[in-house]
Curated annotation (Swiss-Prot):
This is CASP-like protein 1E2. It is a multi-pass membrane protein. Residues 51-82, 144-165 are extracellular. Keywords: Cell membrane, Membrane, Transmembrane, Transmembrane helix. It is found in: Cell membrane. It comes from Vitis vinifera (Grape). Pfam families: CASP_dom. The keyword Disulfide bond does not apply.
Amino acid sequence: MEVESKTSFGGMESKSKEVKVVTGGKLRPFDLVLRVVALALTLVAAVLLGVDKQTKVVSLQLLPTLPPMDVPVTAKWRYLSAFVYFVVSNAIACSYAALSLLLSVGNSKGNKGLGLAITVMDLVMVALLFSSNGAAGAIGLMGYEGNSRVRWGKVCNVFGKFCNQVAVALGLSFFGGLAFFLLVVMAAFALNKRH
């Protein structure tokens, strides 16, 4: 004779061979936390790079016989298409994170079609964020190191604040993309458990 013990702990109900979520499994708290994290990180990354601007006075010598001229030079995110792509991608991901958060909370009936659409869009956000991070990272690296083969000098020695702000925005966006990636992985594990 098998004795079935019934214990309840942290929203989980356990019998001898099965574990089920008492709340019905419709609302996953870790899913909501990751969506809030993705929303916050992509919002801060977009705003941080969107307000990034630095002006410096640079000495420019046109001819060796002429004295150098001091010229104000400004670095803005809008001057590089990779940074524009980065800001727009993070704004899209942030908007989607807010929408998907509302849809996830509102999906109390467990609509499978909506769940699949959210998972597919999470995957699209991973691709969008990682591609924009790669593009902005490549330009940022060019700013830090330059490229001697094409005679592009490094500019981060002059525009240090601008470059540091780009680096922080890239890091935040990377972790925002990682949050979306974890959402996709969780959805894949949930799908695997069902089958």
